[in-house]
Design a protein with these regions (language model features):
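Bacterial N-terminal signal peptides
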Residues: 10-21
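Formylglycine-dependent sulfatase
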Residues: 2-4, 20-436, 444-465, 469-472, ...
Length: 511
């Protein structure tokens, strides 16, 4: 037996040597295949887009988002996808750190803490080439994101800067350049491509046209007021309808930019080995949208496509996932170790068609948008209800922000003088109440605050208890204040500290 074993070993060795000698010229290709086995990662975001502005998520405007809809057919659509903080920079930095803003240091529009580990940092160490297109200044400090490709900074006179992250053909051109870099370097890629549509200024407005050296609408189309739908959380009056048409024109232009990115990926030949994640950073910049804690603030049109892994055309309406889960999910997908302090949890099992426990509640936060102004809010959502606590609502402090600077808010203020229903909505938006409760199953637009309805007393108690539990889990510094909210001066003292903190945050107002 021993002799036969030695003979077998010799024969196997000779066969191996022959094989290596005969195919030595192909060894580099074998090495490339092993490297390419690790998937590329493409994160695509849009700026200030409400979830149901997308055809695949319920928008009825014909032809509004054909490219996003096509992506949904190729992957999995999440009907309970959320972001955790409904303002640009904190939302985006949470996605790439797996941490709430109060844990990564970016509560307002300021750089996060230098000791926080980012997703591109970990991918860079694993051999990825990293790139970013659009919203570049919202990843700070810049060195923590390890960008290899950032034409916004490296090509200061380039057409990319002149396009302001809103030109579809530019996304195609610059994405293709990056994909070629990946192929030339023989490195898997990580690209974050961020359309700055449909952020204000909306497409076709005078401010939008003046921000370009050419007409950006030459690559898109302009929707008319009679072609669009006004969401139920806004009054359907002429000025609102006019601005909503401009918003939807921006939504469509964003979709064309996404189409450019996906076209470049397809033509690069790397699409079959690429994980694609699509989402919005927060809801639209209208009253009761962005910079709040409502359904239309935090729900995002989340889509994940991964050829050969995610079953095309699937829909998950059961599990709640959020922005802080993105980094853990990507790390799980590419088999890299997790950060032990992460707030988020991987939802890779869902992408593989499995069920997952502890995916029913989502905790959302809000801190500030403009410098020196803070409106701290917290919310907990389950599959039906949402409970919101507004630390700032004292009956005197008035809400202001990105949503109160446009035509819609001005029109609402004017209409409120004669229309009591609009006046009620305006007044509530400005001053709010400390607590809010909504039945999103029957009232997704948060039109009826149920906090004082005795029929929901038990539900309110459960959600208050859940809020405390989640605040502990996510190390929210507002925990003790919320717990002791009914004690004298607790809220007022907390708000004094918030105002002091606001003086040193929110410096980066290019949101």
């Amino acid at each position: 037996m021993k002799g036969r074993g030695n003979l077998s070993f010799v024969l196997l060795s000779l066969l191996t040597l022959f094989s290596l000698k005969g195919f030595s010229s192909h060894l580099p290709l074998i090495s490339i295949k092993k490297e390419k086995a690790r998937p590329n990662i493409l994160i695509i975001t849009v700026d200030d887009m409400t979830y149901n502005s997308v055809g695949a998520f319920g928008c009825k405007i014909p032809g509004i988002t054909p490219n996003i809809d096509a992506l949904a057919r190729r992957g999995m659509r999440f009907n309970r996808g959320f972001i955790n903080t409904a303002v640009c920079q904190p939302s985006r930095q949470s996605m790439l750190t797996g941490l709430y803003p109060h844990n990564n240091g970016s509560e307002g529009l300021e750089p996060m803490s230098i000791d926080v580990v980012t997703l591109p940092e970990k991918l860079k160490k694993a051999g990825y080439i990293n790139g970013v297109l659009g919203k570049e200044i919202h990843y700070q400090p810049m060195e923590k994101f390890q960008w290899d490709y950032i034409p916004f900074l490296t090509e200061k006179d380039s057409t990319w800067r002149k396009g302001s992250g809103r030109i579809p053909s530019f996304f195609y051109d610059y994405a293709m350049t990056f994909f070629k870099m990946s192929q030339k370097n023989n490195e898997p890629f990580f690209l974050v491509a961020n359309s700055q549509d449909p952020h204000r200024p909306f497409a076709g407005t005078e401010e939008d046209l003046q921000s370009f050296e050419f007409n950006p609408l030459g690559q898109s189309r302009q929707f008319q007021p009679d072609e669009i739908e006004v969401p139920a959380f806004l009054p359907d009056i002429p000025e609102v309808r006019k601005e909503m048409a401009q918003y939807y024109s921006s939504v469509h232009r964003a979709d064309l930019s996404i189409g450019g990115i996906l076209k470049a990926l397809s033509e690069s030949g790397m699409a079959d080995n690429t994980i694609i994640v699509f989402m919005s950073d927060n809801g639209s910049a209208f009253p009761y949208g962005k910079s709040q804690c409502y359904y239309n603030s935090n729900r995002t049109p989340l889509i994940v496509a991964w050829p050969g892994v995610v079953k095309p055309g699937t829909v998950d309406s059961t599990h709640a996932v959020s922005g802080i889960d993105l980094m853990p999910t990507i790390l799980d997908a590419v088999k890299l170790p997790q950060e032990t302090n992460a707030d988020g949890k991987s939802y890779l099992p869902l992408l593989l068609g499995k069920k997952q426990k502890n995916k029913n509640y989502v905790y959302t936060t809000y801190y500030q948008i403009f410098a020196k102004i803070r409106y701290p809010m917290r919310s907990v959502l389950n599959d039906r209800f949402s409970y919101i606590y507004n630390f700032w609502a004292d009956g005197k402090t008035s809400m202001t922000g990105d949503a109160t600077g446009g035509l819609t808010w001005k029109a609402m203020l004017a209409a409120a003088k004669k229309d009591s229903a609009v006046a009620k909505r305006v007044n509530f938006y400005k001053y709010r109440t400390p607590e809010e409760l909504y039945d999103y199953k029957n009232d997704p637009d948060a039109l009826h605050n149920l906090i004082d309805d005795p029929a929901y007393t038990q539900e309110i108690k459960k959600l208050r208890k859940r809020m405390l539990k989640l605040m502990i889990e996510y190390k929210d510094p507002a925990y003790e204040t919320y717990r002791d909210r009914n004690k004298k001066n607790v809220i007022s003292d907390f708000m004094k500290l918030q105002k002091e903190k606001a003086k040193n945050t929110g410096k980066n107002i290019l949101f």
